[in-house]
Curated annotation (Swiss-Prot):
This is CASP-like protein 1U2. It holds the Pfam family CASP_dom. The chain crosses the membrane at residues 34-54, 78-98, 121-141, 169-189. It comes from Physcomitrium patens (Spreading-leaved earth moss). The keyword DNA-binding does not apply.
């Protein structure tokens, strides 16, 4: 009589330990992803709103002086970049919310995780470039610049301090949004790492 054959499931594929390990990592990625997306949407929305209401007009002995974002291409780019990232973050937050409920999401599969990593990287690059350009203009407006007596940029903030304070707040919010996007990129990379190890 032949001896019975006992099939032992390979560890990491069919075992309960593997399932709970994968489920634990998926829950962490999904919940953290939703939190980061929500915070990013809040930071970028704040930057856009603050920039849009930053216009200020003040009277001087030479007449009226107006500070507004429309007059600075760097500030226009800052608003556009934050608006684009805001829309993307809201859509990603909705998807992340459903992924928490369904226990399946973009970070559960390699192709979608790679796409998430790429889009996050591009969005973070656009946001940091806009924030850096706006920061250079803001510093110039606050401190002025004298290039060996040949060119002089006046300190605009002496006349429109509210405008400068608001733009500074928007720039800070933009850098916060960039930091959150950077963390989202790391999260996608972490998900890809665990997905690749789950195959072996």
């Amino acid at each position: 009589m032949a001896e019975p054959v006992i099939v032992v499931p390979r560890k990491g594929v069919y075992s309960d330990d593997s399932y709970h390990h994968h489920h634990r990592h998926h829950s962490f990625h999904s919940c953290t992803n939703f939190l980061l997306r929500t915070l990013t949407a809040g930071a970028t929305a704040a930057a856009v709103v603050v920039m849009l209401i930053s216009t200020q007009t003040s009277g001087t002995i030479y007449g009226y002086f107006r500070g507004r974002w429309r007059d600075y291409p760097a500030y226009k780019w800052l608003i556009i970049a934050n608006a684009v990232v805001f829309v993307y973050s809201v859509m990603a937050a909705i998807v992340a919310c459903f992924s928490v409920i369904a226990r399946r999401g973009p970070l559960s599969y390699s192709p979608s995780a790679w796409l998430t990593l790429l889009v996050d990287f591009l969005a973070a690059s656009a946001l940091i470039s806009a924030a850096s350009a706006a920061l250079a203009v803001a510093l110039l407006a606050r401190n002025g610049q004298d290039l060996q007596g040949t060119h002089y940029w006046p300190t605009v903030c002496n006349y429109v301090s509210k405008f400068c304070d608001y733009t500074q707040g928007a720039i800070i919010a933009s850098f916060v949004g960039f930091g959150l996007l950077f963390l989202s990129t790391l999260l996608a990379a972490s998900a890809l790492y665990h997905l690749s190890h789950r195959r072996h």
